[in-house]
């Protein structure tokens, strides 16, 4: 049997609770903690959990819309749309305003020479 050698990276000291920054191209770049493999399944799991309730919500919304549509049809027979338009129009005045002509004030001023 062959012995397997386990390669371990040297332990890095944490500074202020996170890994130290690495210099790349003259600028400091911080390293991200954690494995990228672990984060991908969590995102997928969240999406699947969100899809299931949304389909149930869509069905309840559709049922509510059907109920509302039926009620709106009943209301349209009882209260026609023309009556609603008349109710929202601006009322006409019974007596028209008489607009008096403005007075012209002539101010006499000396002429310019």
Swiss-Prot record:
GO biological process, one term: regulation of translation
Matches recorded under Pfam families: DAP (PF15228)
Entry keyword Coiled coil: no
Keywords attached to this entry: Translation regulation
Region (Disordered): 1-55
UniProt keyword Thylakoid, yes or no: no
Known partners and oligomeric status: Associates with ribosomes; preventing translation. Interacts with eiF5a (eif5a and eif5a2); preventing translation.
PANTHER family noted in UniProt: DEATH-ASSOCIATED PROTEIN 1, DEATH-ASSOCIATED PROTEIN-LIKE 1
Task performed by this protein: Ribosome-binding protein that promotes ribosome hibernation, a process during which ribosomes are stabilized in an inactive state and preserved from proteasomal degradation. Acts via its association with eiF5a (eif5a and eif5a2) at the polypeptide exit tunnel of the ribosome, preventing mRNA translation. Plays a key role in ribosome hibernation in the mature egg by preventing mRNA translation, leading to ribosome inactivation. Ribosomes, which are produced in large quantities during oogenesis, are stored and translationally repressed in the egg and early embryo.
Family per record: Belongs to the DAP-DAPL1 family.
Annotated protein name in UniProt: Death-associated protein-like 1
UniProt source species: Xenopus tropicalis
Gene from which this protein is expressed: dapl1
């Amino acid at each position: 049997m062959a012995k397997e050698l386990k390669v371990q990276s040297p332990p890095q000291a944490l500074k202020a609770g996170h890994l130290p920054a690495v210099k790349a191209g003259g600028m400091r770049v911080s390293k991200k903690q954690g494995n990228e493999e672990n984060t991908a399944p969590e995102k997928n799991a969240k999406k699947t959990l969100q899809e299931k309730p949304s389909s149930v919500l869509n069905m309840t919304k559709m049922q509510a819309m059907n109920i509302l549509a039926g009620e709106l049809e009943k209301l349209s027979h009882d209260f026609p749309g023309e009556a609603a338009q008349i109710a929202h129009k601006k009322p006409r005045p019974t007596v028209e305003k008489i607009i008096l002509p403005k007075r012209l004030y002539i101010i006499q001023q000396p002429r310019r020479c």
